[in-house]
């Protein structure tokens, strides 16, 4: 791989996928009203991305088993989910991007602005948390249908770019990719094998601040 960090999903990702039984929704206040983003049944992708990155940064091995609702790791993942949304402004960012036309999202925001930032992060050894916009809607209740992944490497071939990502929905899988062509004429498209039921419309770099995860054996 042309550019990569030391993170590898099969080794450093959480050992379980983003599938949870129904649990209490965590409702947060935003300028758009209250938005529930912590219902475990709807997924905890952002919390899993941040938690995996926290374990990696501290040199700890992620726990091997899926935590129950009273487990400190589960509570930590939920807390990191809220952190990953950067309430309220992060929620508004998803909403603004959901409402924009594909041409603007792809060329001006993702390809021209975000891809160079992601590349720089990888080139300096820092995995890049990404907010993935999948929804085209003005309905704020659909914000939670967007997704979050962790980019840990990239490969270019001609004008084609392939991002290697840790997708919590896929578990510790090293073969998950998002691909695009930044110089494609017309409206460029993203191809991907993320474990989601929607197209990828755009992505942006998510601001990450480390946190201390629940104790685990040191490598």
Predicted feature residues:
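Aromatic-residue hotspot detector
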Residues: 1, 7-16, 21-30, 193-219
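Cys-His-centered catalytic/binding microenvironment captured across papain-like cysteine peptidases
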Residues: 142-146, 155-219
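Short loop/turn segments at secondary-structure transitions that flank enzyme active sites
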Residues: 22, 51-56, 136, 155-157, ...
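Active-site-adjacent substructure of cysteine-protease-like catalytic cores
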Residues: 107-165
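Cysteine-nucleophile protease catalytic domains, especially the papain-like/related folds used
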Residues: 3-112
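Structured loops at beta-to-helix junctions and adjacent beta-edge loops in soluble globular domains
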Residues: 19, 48, 133, 166-168
């Amino acid at each position: 791989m042309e550019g990569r960090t030391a993170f590898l999903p099969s080794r450093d990702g959480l050992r379980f996928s983003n599938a949870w039984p129904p649990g209490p929704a965590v409702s947060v206040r935003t300028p758009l009203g209250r938005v529930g983003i912590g219902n475990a049944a709807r997924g905890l992708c952002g919390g899993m991305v941040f938690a995996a990155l926290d374990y990696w940064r501290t040199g700890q091995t992620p726990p091997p088993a899926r935590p129950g609702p009273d487990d400190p790791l589960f509570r930590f993942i939920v807390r990191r989910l809220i952190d990953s949304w950067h309430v309220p402004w992060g929620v508004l960012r998803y909403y603004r991007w959901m409402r924009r036309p594909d041409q603007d999202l792809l060329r001006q925001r993702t390809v021209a602005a975000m891809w160079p930032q992601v590349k720089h992060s990888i080139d300096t050894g820092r995995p890049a948390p990404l907010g993935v916009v999948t929804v085209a809607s003005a309905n704020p209740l659909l914000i939670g249908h967007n997704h979050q992944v962790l980019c840990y490497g990239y490969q270019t071939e001609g004008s084609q770019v392939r991002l290697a990502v840790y997708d919590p929905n896929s578990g510790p899988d090293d073969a998950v990719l998002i691909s695009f062509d930044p110089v494609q004429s017309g409206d460029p498209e993203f191809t991907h094998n993320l474990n989601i039921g929607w197209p990828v419309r755009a992505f942006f770099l998510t601001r990450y601040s480390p946190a201390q995860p629940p104790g685990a054996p040191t490598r």
